[in-house]
Amino acid sequence: MPPYTTYNYPAKSHEIQYRLTQLGLQPKHMMLIGGFIVAYGMFETTLERALWTLSERSIEQVRPFTETMPTAETFKMLGAGNQKLSEKCNAVLKVAARAAEDLNDYRNSLVHGYILSFGPNDVPSFLRNPHWHGATGRKKAHGDAFIDEPFQDLVLIAAWSLWRLVHAVEKVFTDPEAQADIESMKDDIDRAKSYAGEVRHQAALANHEKN
């Protein structure tokens, strides 16, 4: 008999969910956070296969070269495109790489940041690598993730758009319609770049407006 059958896990789960609401994370927040993490994961895993396509290198019976690539390098490679693709297609990939960089920074702050709670009636935020207690010399980047309206919707849209793009890139040399599909995504990818940049730099933008 599985051990969870003798433990009231539904009640415990609901208790934890209630405790999270007391931190200001309402059900909609948790749903959209989950949706964003899934969509970003779809982009991230499909990106690897898209890079195999762009490199035109076989990975059969060899360790994929992407396995040891730093995240920043994967975005750089995406942005470089491929000389066999059209100028319009490569231009879309270049913008997508910049969007991915901003969105990845937001994702890291959300997943790895400290939750800053102001009580059940206020929306919390997340702070990554803060300089608390007089600490200095951190080599990891500082970051913020805000989940106020409309930021969660914006990052979900951006992540989904990037996934659609790399899904098309993966088959760009086998599907005769893929390149045209990529070109047609220009507006969506421009929008993803705008959204991702806004959420990544929201703290700086807010401080600038105050000044």
Name each model feature, range by range.
Residues 2-38, 45-211:
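Acidic, Ser/Thr/Gly/Pro-rich intrinsically disordered interaction regions
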